Regions:
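Conserved catalytic cores of very large enzyme subunits
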Residues: 1-194
Length: 194
């Protein structure tokens, strides 16, 4: 009951103002994703770099205020991933067989680099680890999980990624920042956005 009341309070807040907590921010991300799926007959709609834009909320609640513990944050991520599985798009039987059901190819990206004062800095943070751990524990087909790899990535995070890959459910995928970023820049994307 308390959890449902908190979810209802979160809905009241995020309907009229910016989220204040990690839970509210994650709930808002889910609602936005759901709206995009409904409005555009969604397919391959990405959450983007979730560990970057949700980290200020996670940091405040889990690391600074300790109003939310890490395990509960991972449980909230589990709930979000499970809710994503409820969204379905009718497909042919052959597609469903080849794709382990009817995935919508919703992608979450973690890791990579951020441009800070013109210098590329490793962007891995504690939420990157929590998202990775959540996906590794749940072993679900959705969301697809991608890691932006670069040579400056810590061995600890790389090892954590390899441990999840060893679970055998095909994630995370790796994208190479050192290849992809220059190509985005060639297309006219600003370096801080590439």
């Amino acid at each position: 009951r308390d959890e449902l009341l908190t979810m209802a309070e979160n809905c009241d807040v995020i309907a009229h103002e910016p989220p204040k907590t990690f839970w509210q921010a994650l709930q808002l991300c889910y609602f936005i994703q759901l709206i995009l799926q409904i409005e555009s007959n969604g397919h391959s709609v990405s959450f983007g770099r979730m560990d970057q834009y949700l980290y200020p909320f996670y940091r405040r609640d889990v690391e600074l205020n300790q109003s939310l513990d890490r395990e509960h944050a991972i449980e909230l991520l589990h709930s979000c991933w499970l809710k994503l599985l409820e969204v379905n798009k009718i497909r042919s039987g052959s597609h469903s067989k080849a794709s382990a059901g009817s995935p919508l190819y919703q992608n979450v990206t973690i890791g990579g680099q951020n441009l800070v004062s013109g210098q590329a800095m490793d962007a891995v943070n504690p939420l990157s680890y929590a998202i990775l751990e959540s996906c590794g524990r749940l072993r679900s087909t959705q969301p697809n999980l991608s890691v932006r790899y670069h040579a400056g990535m810590s061995n600890d995070f790389l090892d954590a990624c390899v441990q999840v890959i060893r679970c055998g459910f095909g994630m995370p995928a790796f994208n190479n920042d050192e290849i992809v970023i220059p190509e985005f820049i060639k297309l006219g994307i600003e370096p801080q956005d590439a």
